[in-house]
Amino acid sequence: MQRRIVLTSLVLVGLLSIAVGAAQQQPAGRAGAPAGGRGGINFGTPSVDNLQVEKLTDTLYLLRGGGGNTAAFITANGVLLVDTKVSGWGQPIIQKLKTLTDKPVTTIVNTHTHFDHVNGNAEFPPTVEVVTSEPTKQYMEQWNPVFGLQGDNPSPFKANGGVGLPKRTFKDTLSIGNGADQVDLYFHGPAHTGGDTWVVFRSARVMHAGDAFAGKNAPIMDKNNGGSALRYADTIAKAAKTPNVDRVITGHSTTMTIADLREFGEFNGDFVRDALAAKKAGKTIDQFVAEWNVPAKYTGYTNPPATNRGQWRSNAQVAWEE
C-alpha cells in the first residue's frame, strides 16, 4: 500500500521526509524519499525488503523506510523500539526484527505524535507497553491535523479501541531498564511539537532526536500540536548538552553528531530572530521569505528556489503569530 500526503507547501525537512536541500542527506535507496521532492510523499510498499537496516552497535539498529527512522534496541528482556512509521509497516518491522533477534518487542517509545512515527503502534500486540511524554499522549488522543499539511490521516487508534496509545507517560525524565540496557527519556520543551521526546541509549552513546532534528534544513513547527518557533532553538540547545552522547539519530536523515545538533539549533534561532526583525521592520512574510538566505556558516544547509520556500513561510508565520 502506498500513502500519499498532499502538501500545502513544499515540506523541506521534518515529519515526513527530507526535501529540497537535504536530498544529499538521504541514504541511497531509502524507501519513503519524496517523489521528485514535490507534490506528494511516497512511503513505499510496506515489506520486509523495503526496510534498510543500519547497525549502530551489537544491540542497537536503525530501520529506515516507511516513515520516520525507527531505532531497535535489543535488551536482555526484549526489544525496545523508538517510533513505528506509517500504517502498514508494523508487521514488516516485526518480521525484520526476527532477522536480528529472537526476542519480542516489549516496549515502544514514540518521539512525538505524528502519523509517520506512531501509526505502526496499532499493529503490535496490545501487550506491548507504549511510552511517551505527557503532552504526546494528549496529542495522540486528540489527533489534531498537522499544521501546514493536507490529507486524510485518520487516527489508527480510534478504529481499534485505542490499541497503540501510550500506557505510560513521563513529565521531564524517565529511565527504562538498568545497566547496559538503560534507556533515558527526556522532555526539554516544545520544538517540532509540544511533546518531543529525546531517547538516549546510554551504553551506545547514541540519542534519537525524532523530528525535533529531522535533518539539516527547516523543520516543521507544528503549532496545532504544541510546536513552537520561539522556543525551538532553546529546546535544541538543551538537548545538545546531553552528556555522553556521540551520535544522534535524526528523524528522517543520516545519523549525525552532537555538533550537528547544536548547529541546527543555532540555524533555527537565526531564522526566527531574522523573521521577527523583518516583522518589526514592517515587512510582509512573503518579503522576508523571498529575501532570506541561509547564512554561509551553516554547511550542509541550502537555499531552496524562490518558488519553493513554503516551509520557510510556514515557520515565519508560526513565529509571527506565537
Region annotations inferred by a language model:
Residues 1-11:
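Bacterial N-terminal signal peptides that target proteins for export
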Residues 14-43, 241-244, 255-322:
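Accessory terminal helices/loops
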Residues 22-41, 58-60, 65, 90, ...:
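PEST-like low-complexity, intrinsically disordered acidic/proline/serine-rich tracts
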Residues 51-97, 197-201, 205-211:
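Conserved beta-strand hairpin/beta-sheet module of binuclear metal-dependent hydrolase folds
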Residues 57, 70, 90-94, 121, ...:
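Extracytoplasmic/secreted envelope proteins and their assembly/folding machinery
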Residues 59, 73, 83, 97, ...:
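Divalent metal-coordination and catalytic microenvironments
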Residues 78-80, 86-88, 175, 182-274:
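Metallo-beta-lactamase
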Residues 95-177, 194, 273:
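Active-site HxH/HxHxD metal-binding segment of metal-dependent hydrolases
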